[in-house]
């Protein structure tokens, strides 16, 4: 396909001007983690602008500590009747760690439940005129261009209709390494420019080297263009945001000169598989309870989840530059889970970090299958465990350290739960197979009886289950109380049925995820790096043999644990069955939950429905229509051969190549770049050059105007007569 064959691309001039605006370089230096930088923390502009209420911390964190101390005391009392053995001490220690983890979530849930009972409304700032400039950033890495560019198209158009569009510029920041996807991005950008250039300023840049992944992508933008803008609104490749939410974030940031970062709580949408629908439903019913409670008590010491948030550019560039950690990955090198760290550093510098739990209209998508969730969690697990290197950073607020610690525990809790199960099983087997030593070596007139307080143990079990499922219960109570909310998910009866189904299916999946997280932690401790692979976002299906291979150890672990339990008694096996059944049938669970067809069956039945699915926001419907249109626009992908052949297409491509200077003369040349230079130089024609270039090398050529010009000068094909005439 040539340029002239596409009505959208009838000109060699890039519609709307340059692919990127003129640079305005600014400094974003890596922060020193071993000492507090000079001038930090800054003085707040408004009196008490970054001060939080201690009473809220006391109620939630203090309540969690008191609840944990009570539970630990009760567990100790269960064992103390006959004297506590070393194995029982281990059970007590593991129980203490795990209970503290769920107690904090429970107390946050209580706070969120009480707030949501009052149905708080978002602060209305619609009348505020925006005099600040915001760059809306959409980083992408080997994603489907139709998804990314159609979302930007719809959001830009709806934002332009608010009267505030002049205050925003849009940037698609590509780190794509696949040459085919890179060319599709350029095709999609041309369509996007054609649609939006009259009402919005939309830009595109693909980095030559994706150093430091997403954090490096955003940092590169800040150093080159960040000084042009007051704020950065960071999205993800699957993000959508209503125009009222975008303007609301900018207005809140403008109204609060001490705000460094404002994070929304995104709703999950567009789930097509059963697994995605399960996550959507749980996040919609129970998520607001935890999110609202968290935002209420952390106050000005909130967190950043990497996207769907607005950041003050000054705060980000002066305080959140990420250093490289000493050593090699997985614990050294670039900071992977950058978001938590950036929020902590911004707060350290004296800016507030707020979770806007009252602001709706923020959306994202979720992994479609257990395997896709495992791939994502492997990367997140490495990043969160890496935070153990960040915890000692000088000057961090204790709540920021708590965010880092809870992120670490999100994955370490699985090994702790597994160890608790194993030690409890060992206690049962010990009591069954090992004869008690009633009289020890120490002189005593009375024997040592291996007994436990069974009534207290059962009571503690019920308390633990109440704490564990408390946030779910709070979410269900809010659902039942709010008739409008209940109707939006299909009515109270279907909602209750969906809750029961979600609890059962989640209970089956939980032990699988526990072993997945245990495996991730183990591989990280063994020094294995996760790498960076693009995410699947739609169909989660996989061949059965692949699933058997991926879940083989989970099934084996379930069989071994079941065998150990039955050695003691059928009663113990029955008690452990909720955790074992999921492991035994891990493969069919993984297959069924990753199926779009099964997801569609549940959608038609109205099970696991959410308000966003039954009555989607207008922007979600527009995004679906726009994506279908973009798929048609780029149905005939460009190729590098076409770019070299068509001069007009070449000029359009070069107009979208990053203008960052190439390697300066005299500086060392990287191995791959040298190899590409040799291949291009030795090629007799374009066809032979393309035949010897691999995909990574093609991506490099696409980003290098000099190499492209060299290839363009070559004949399209090599003809023997050319060699004769040359001789």
From Swiss-Prot:
Cellular compartments annotated: Cell inner membrane
GO BP field: glucan biosynthetic process
Residue spans crossing the bilayer: 58-78, 97-117, 278-298, 408-428, 460-480, 496-516, 572-592
Keyword Transmembrane helix: yes
Pathway participation: Glycan metabolism; osmoregulated periplasmic glucan (OPG) biosynthesis
Enzyme Commission designation: 2.4.1.-
Function of the molecule: Involved in the biosynthesis of osmoregulated periplasmic glucans (OPGs).
Assigned protein family: Belongs to the glycosyltransferase 2 family. OpgH subfamily.
Protein name: Glucans biosynthesis glucosyltransferase H
Species: Shewanella baltica (strain OS223)
């Amino acid at each position: 396909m040539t340029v002239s064959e596409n009505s959208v691309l009838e000109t060699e001039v890039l519609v709307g001007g340059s692919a990127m605006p003129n640079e305005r370089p600014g400094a974003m230096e890596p922060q020193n983690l071993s000492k507090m930088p000079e001038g930090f923390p800054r003085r707040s502009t408004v009196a008490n602008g970054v001060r939080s209420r201690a009473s809220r911390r006391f109620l939630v964190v203090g309540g969690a500590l008191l609840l944990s101390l009570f539970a630990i005391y009760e567990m100790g009392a269960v064992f103390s009747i006959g004297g506590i053995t070393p194995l029982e001490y281990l059970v007590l220690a593991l129980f203490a760690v795990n209970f503290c983890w769920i107690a904090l979530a429970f107390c946050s849930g209580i706070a969120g439940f009480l707030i949501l009972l009052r149905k708080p409304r978002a602060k209305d700032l619609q009348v505020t005129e925006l005099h600040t400039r915001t760059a809306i950033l959409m980083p992408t890495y080997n994603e489907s261009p139709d998804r990314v560019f159609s979302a930007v198209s719809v959001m830009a158009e709806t934002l332009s209709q608010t009267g505030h569009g002049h205050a925003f510029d849009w940037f698609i920041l590509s780190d794509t390494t696949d040459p085919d996807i890179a060319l599709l991005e350029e095709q999609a950008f041309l369509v996007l420019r054609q649609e939006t250039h009259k009402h919005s300023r939309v830009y595109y840049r693909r980095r030559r080297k994706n150093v430091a992944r997403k954090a490096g992508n955003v940092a590169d933008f800040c150093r080159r263009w960040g000084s042009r803008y007051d704020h950065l609104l960071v999205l993800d490749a699957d993000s959508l945001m209503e125009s009222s939410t975008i303007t609301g974030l900018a207005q809140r940031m403008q109204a609060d000169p001490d705000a460094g970062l404002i994070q929304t709580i995104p709703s999950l949408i567009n789930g097509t598989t059963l697994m995605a629908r399960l996550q959507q439903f749980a996040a919609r019913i129970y998520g607001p309870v935890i999110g609202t409670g968290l935002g209420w008590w952390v106050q000005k010491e909130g967190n950043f989840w990497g996207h769907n948030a607005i950041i003050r550019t000054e705060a980000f560039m002066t305080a959140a530059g990420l250093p490289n950690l000493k050593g090699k990955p997985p614990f050294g090198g670039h900071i992977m889970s950058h978001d938590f760290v950036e929020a902590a550093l911004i707060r350290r510098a004296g800016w507030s970090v707020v979770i806007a739990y009252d602001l709706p209209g923020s959306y994202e998508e979720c992994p479609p299958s257990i395997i896709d969730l495992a791939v994502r969690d492997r990367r997140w697990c490495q990043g969160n465990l890496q935070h153990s290197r960040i915890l000692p950073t000088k000057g961090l607020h204790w709540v920021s350290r708590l965010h880092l610690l809870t992120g670490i525990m999100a994955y370490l809790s699985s090994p702790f739960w597994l160890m608790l199960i194993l030690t409890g099983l060992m206690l049962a087997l010990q009591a069954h197979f090992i004869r008690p030593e009633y009289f020890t070596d120490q002189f005593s007139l009375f024997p040592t009886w291996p007994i436990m307080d069974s009534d207290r143990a059962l009571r503690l079990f019920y308390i633990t289950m109440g704490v564990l499922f408390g946030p779910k219960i709070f979410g269900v109570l809010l659902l039942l109380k709010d008739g409008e909310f209940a109707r939006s998910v299909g009515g109270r009866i279907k909602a209750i049925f969906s809750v029961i189904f979600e609890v059962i299916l989640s209970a089956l999946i939980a032990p699988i995820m526990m072993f997945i997280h245990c495996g991730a932690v183990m591989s990280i401790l063994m020094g294995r790096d996760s790498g960076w692979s693009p995410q699947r976002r739609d169909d989660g299906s996989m061949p059965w043999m692949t699933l058997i291979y991926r879940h083989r150890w989970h099934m084996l672990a379930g069989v071994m644990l079941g065998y150990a339990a039955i050695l003691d008694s059928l009663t113990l096996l029955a008690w452990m069955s909720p955790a074992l059944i999921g492991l035994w049938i891990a493969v069919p669970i993984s297959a069924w939950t990753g199926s779009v067809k099964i997801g569609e069956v549940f959608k038609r039945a109205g099970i696991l429905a959410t308000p966003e699915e039954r009555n989607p926001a207008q922007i979600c419907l527009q995004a679906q229509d726009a994506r279908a249109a973009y798929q048609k626009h780029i149905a005939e992908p460009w190729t590098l051969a076409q770019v070299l052949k068509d001069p007009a297409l070449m000029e359009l491509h070069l107009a979208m190549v990053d203008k960052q200077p190439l390697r300066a003369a005299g500086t060392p040349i990287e191995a791959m770049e040298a190899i590409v230079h040799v291949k291009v130089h030795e090629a007799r024609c374009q066809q032979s050059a393309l035949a010897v270039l691999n995909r990574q090398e093609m991506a490099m050529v696409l980003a290098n105007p000099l190499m492209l010009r060299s290839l363009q000068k070559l004949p399209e094909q090599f003809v023997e007569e050319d060699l004769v005439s040359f001789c």
